[in-house]
A protein has these predicted regions:
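Acidic/glycine-enriched edge-of-secondary-structure segments
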Residues: 17-29, 83, 105-113
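N-terminal short beta-loop-beta anion/metal-coordinating cradle
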Residues: 1-55
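Catalytic cores of processing enzymes, dominated by hydrolases/peptidases
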Residues: 87-167
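Hydrophobic/aromatic beta-strand patches that form the interior of the parallel beta-sheet core
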Residues: 4, 49-51, 80, 132-137
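A conserved C-terminal secondary-structure "cap"
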Residues: 144-238
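Short strand-loop junctions, especially beta-strand C-caps/beta-turns
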Residues: 53-56, 139-141
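Internal, conserved structured core segments that host functional sites
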Residues: 46, 54-102, 122
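A generic structural motif
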Residues: 2-9, 78-84, 172-173
Length: 238
């Protein structure tokens, strides 16, 4: 159910985030970009408040401060920011998911330096104001050229379930994720260069998985990783 809104002309460039024309009870109405907060009761003692909006074009500091005030009014105990980004990752593997808590940075947090979006600004401001926070980012294959990805949504939902300790119903996401994978596989089969590119991504992904195992299990796994890397290079004629 809708419980709050943030409405302000000063946040949006309407040539970028355009208003929408629709019909409501037979009459034409213009819907302007705005932020809507929804209350979702997921357990007798747990309510999620979802903040959904187009990313503002202007006045991010003021926008984030308004968001923090609403969080205080709703007595929010923990703020989770979620985002997706294009990356070099294969659709044939689990999508990379980076999760960082207020006191525990993920690899992406430690390594990244550059432009950020509104989720990062909200996360930083929430930390500064004393909220407990978690940041979640999922990577989606850039070669598909689409930001609609049911697999990413399903993985984020599972991660959120783990964080709050409540199993959230994925609905029909599993079926949509399989359809997304199937469509991506058809695309790669129709393009030899793309298929070869995905094969390289798969190898890099698998090698990173093995490198993570090395970090956990030590020398025997390291020796196996070296042997597999040498075999791959020989197969490439290098």
């Amino acid at each position: 159910r809708e419980i709050r809104h943030i409405r302000c002309d000063g946040y949006y460039d309407y040539q970028v985030a355009r208003p929408m024309l629709c019909k409501v009870t037979g009459r034409r109405r213009i819907l302007w970009p705005q932020t809507t907060f929804y209350a979702i009761d997921v357990a007798p003692s747990t309510t999620l408040y979802a903040q959904i909006a187009p990313e503002p074009n202007y006045r991010w500091n003021d926008y984030c401060r308004q968001s923090m005030r609403i969080a205080e009014e709703l007595d929010v105990r923990h703020i989770v920011t979620m985002g997706a980004m294009f990356a070099d990752c294969p659709h044939t593997r689990a999508l990379p998911l980076d999760i960082s808590d207020q006191q525990c940075q993920c690899d992406m947090d430690r390594e990244y330096s550059g432009p950020v979006g509104i989720p990062t600004v909200l996360d930083c401001m929430a930390c500064e104001e004393g909220f407990s926070t978690t940041s979640m980012w999922v990577s989606v294959p850039q070669y598909l050229g689409s930001d609609e990805c049911a697999q990413a949504t399903m993985q984020m939902l599972a991660a959120l379930s783990d964080r709050i300790g409540v199993e959230l119903d994925p609905g029909d996401l599993a079926g949509k994720a399989e359809q997304w994978k199937a469509q991506a596989s058809v695309l790669t089969r129709c393009n030899d260069d793309l298929a070869q590119y995905v094969k390289h991504l798969e190898h890099d992904y698998d090698m990173q998985e093995k490198a993570d195992q090395v970090a956990r299990f030590g020398a025997p796994a390291a020796e196996q990783l070296v042997r597999e890397a040498e075999a791959f290079l020989r197969s490439r004629g290098k």
